[in-house]
Amino acid sequence: MADLLSSLKNLSHSSGVYQYFDKNRQLLYIGKAKNLKKRIKSYFSIHNNEITPNHRASLRIQMMVKQIAFLETILVENEQDALILENSLIKQLKPKYNILLRDDKTYPYIYMDFSTDFPIPLITRKILKQPGVKYFGPFTSGAKDILDSLYELLPLVQKKNCIKDKKACMFYQIERCKAPCENKITKEEYSKIAKECLEMIENRDKLIKELELKMERLSNNLRFEEALIYRDRIAKIQKIAPFTCMDLAKLYDLDIFAFYGASNKAVLVKMFMRGGKIISSAFEKIHSLNGFDTDEAMKQAIINHYQSHLPLMPEQILLSACSNEALKELQEFISHQYSKKIALSIPKKGDKLALIEIAMKNAQEIFSQEKTSDEDLILEEVRSLFNLECVPYRVEIFDTSHHSNSQCVGGMVVYENNAFQKNSYRRYHLKGSNEYDQMSELLTRRALDFAKEPPPNLWVIDGGRAQLNIALEILKSSGSFVEVIAISKEKRDSKAYRSKGGAKDIIHTPSDTFKLLPSDKRLQWVQKLRDESHRYAINFHRSTKLKNMKQIALLKEKGIGEASVKKLLDYFGSFEAIEKASEQEKNAVLKKRI
């Protein structure tokens, strides 16, 4: 405690970020302050050099303060910089007592550029700095389905560069385009098509009605497979916003955030209203062993959503709850980020309060559906057995694959909300000369990406204690808190025993080794994760090997033998790099003309 007491006596009055650590140097909490000295001292009571938690703090904070042994600070220019740095560090380092919201993606917008002669609908996530652009959104899902439908229902210019080609393409022949490239339609005639496109984007009901008519026509013509495609697309578009029936007399443009939590679970709901109608919505489920802080949740939600410059900002942002201090901070953040005043408020009455109540009702409904399943019970048992600090709600599983140390690849699969999250899977080409170097490269590359993609609760490694130790060293150097276990086959005579029916799995933790019965559900849970990562890595290896064999065959056709191919690969690193290299560069490597 002497180190902590000394740190508390020498605090700066500057703006900055503070980090609390326990006696083992495990990161407990990250916060930010306009005045570091004033903010940090508010956590503690100091009497006769004895440090105790401030009795006015919440029980969650008091419990955390009892564990603090060290603190570190990072000074910045102003409070806005501190707010952004705090959010970035929380995502990267995942402290024990901070809430981590993973959904920080920028939602897509549909736009049309009416400064062009023949405008078409396209998707963007950025602001396009040109006049005449009209945006629609954001869309939390279904933007591509809307776009595909528009191009199939209307004879729009089908590609951005079509006009430059000056020659009608296949789309004209199948009556999906009017061929303005050959002047077969005037700008005035096309503007009517663009106007109808605009109406379908703004009026989802009209779009769905047209899709239903097309589906019926296909069905009547016995084209059932195509009709099924339209049926599925209609269902997706109808799901984009379950609140589209809600229509306010006032043409509000609002973003609405509602947070509801209890015990160790919470839900954040986001709704987006444009022109008085809810056009899309999204929600995120959050888990925490140490309770929730509404201010912290709202701050993360707002910063995650608005830190990238969005094409279409609302007139006002509505929050379900937030302290005055946090509201002021967020207001300053938005004003600074967008150089204009966009009000943040907590409605107390009227139709805006009704919108918050609807968002809260949906958050509570989603929360109530989160019943404890058998899988949740297994997660608790896994935590207890392997002495994990956190329930492994989100898990990343790693495996490598190679053939005689060639075509070395790695795969990462992700398990969350009791299901494999295939959109989060990642594949890696590796350079290591052995399985340990390959695993080290795979895990290092993942750890370097923590700032963009926050770390999980748990890593599962396909390997033994050596691979486990590699993972622990990498995580230690990253500064992020992620727990690790590894699973390997039982070895006999220093070899993995894999004969049918005899392969026993061993689970390694930093402090123990477990040999569980094949019927143990905790072992089966880890095996399920390992098997999926193994399948994913093997499939990637096979596809890489097949692709390489085809590329080797193509080079052989050019008179380049296997030895020369190996030289080129060793030098350039990939077939793609070989193809991009000039003749002079390849000649220099091979010392002969190719």
From Swiss-Prot:
Gene Ontology biological process terms, A to Z: nucleotide-excision repair; SOS response
Keyword terms, alphabetized: Cytoplasm, DNA damage, DNA excision, DNA repair, Excision nuclease, SOS response
GO molecular-function term, one example from the UniProt record: DNA binding
PANTHER family: UVRABC SYSTEM PROTEIN C, UVRC/OXIDOREDUCTASE
Function: The UvrABC repair system catalyzes the recognition and processing of DNA lesions. UvrC both incises the 5' and 3' sides of the lesion. The N-terminal half is responsible for the 3' incision and the C-terminal half is responsible for the 5' incision.
Family label: Belongs to the UvrC family.
Subunit-level organization: Interacts with UvrB in an incision complex.
Protein name in the entry: UvrABC system protein C
